[in-house]
From Swiss-Prot:
Source species, domain of life: Viruses
Residues bound to Mg(2+): 92
Gene Ontology MF annotations: ATP hydrolysis activity; magnesium ion binding; nucleotide binding; RNA binding
Localization per Swiss-Prot or TrEMBL: Host cytoplasm
InterPro entries, alphabetized: Rotavirus_A/C_NSP5
Quaternary structure and interacting proteins, as annotated: Homodimer. Interacts with VP1. Interacts with VP2. Interacts with NSP2; this interaction leads to up-regulation of NSP5 hyperphosphorylation and formation of virus factories. Interacts with NSP6. Participates in the selective exclusion of host proteins from stress granules (SG) and P bodies (PB). Also participates in the sequestration of these remodeled organelles in viral factories.
Pfam families recorded: Rota_NS26
UniProt key word NAD: no
Function: Plays an essential role in the viral genome replication. Participates, together with NSP2, in the formation of viral factories (viroplasms), which are large inclusions in the host cytoplasm where replication intermediates are assembled and viral RNA replication takes place. Orchestrates the recruitment of viroplasmic proteins such as capsid proteins to these factories. Participates in the selective exclusion of host proteins from stress granules (SG) and P bodies (PB). Also participates in the sequestration of these remodeled organelles in viral factories.
Protein name as annotated: Non-structural protein 5
Species whose genome carries this gene: Rotavirus A (strain RVA/Human/United States/Wa/1974/G1P1A[8]) (RV-A)
Compositionally biased tracts (Low complexity): 17-30
Sequence segments annotated as region (Disordered): 17-36
PTM note: O-glycosylated.
Amino acid sequence: MSLSIDVTSLPSISSSIFKNESSSTTSTLSGKSIGRNEQYVSSDIEAFNKYMLSKSPEDIGPSDSASNNPLTSFSIRSNAVKTNADAGVSMDSSTQSRPSSNVGCDQMDFSLTKGINVSASLDSCVSISTNHKKEKSKKDKSRKHYPRIEADSDYEDYVLDDSDSDDGKCKNCKYKKKYFALRMRMKQVAMQLIEDL
């Protein structure tokens, strides 16, 4: 974006300084000038008191106490340049007042370079891995695993005793031999403990 201002078509500059007395000076730039009315007011304690008393407490804000000194704030604002609105600068300069060539034409160029480079690349990767365990069959669930107990008999030739077993319930049982062997061994261990005591 480029903005060009041709100062040859601007009005004349006139500045008036007021401090109990006024004087007028005029300066010319490229045949034309800018008009502005400036007024400076010296800080006055009475003017400050009138200013503060004329405002309600609700209207007094941080801008009234610059540098934590209200008198300094009042002096800063009262000494500020006051521009006359009637002597404003018009940016709509007529093309008839411009010369046919750029000779004698002062130009001010304001160049604004604004570059916006936005790179919005979003890489997203979602990986979901699920491992399903094989479901055991109903047979495996209903089946209970007991620890295996093995017992060896001290006697190679021993006779199974059916005297304390229920009639007809433990015939041809494959665990009967191991049961009696384990029972005999437990009896021997118990007898040995009694003897040791």
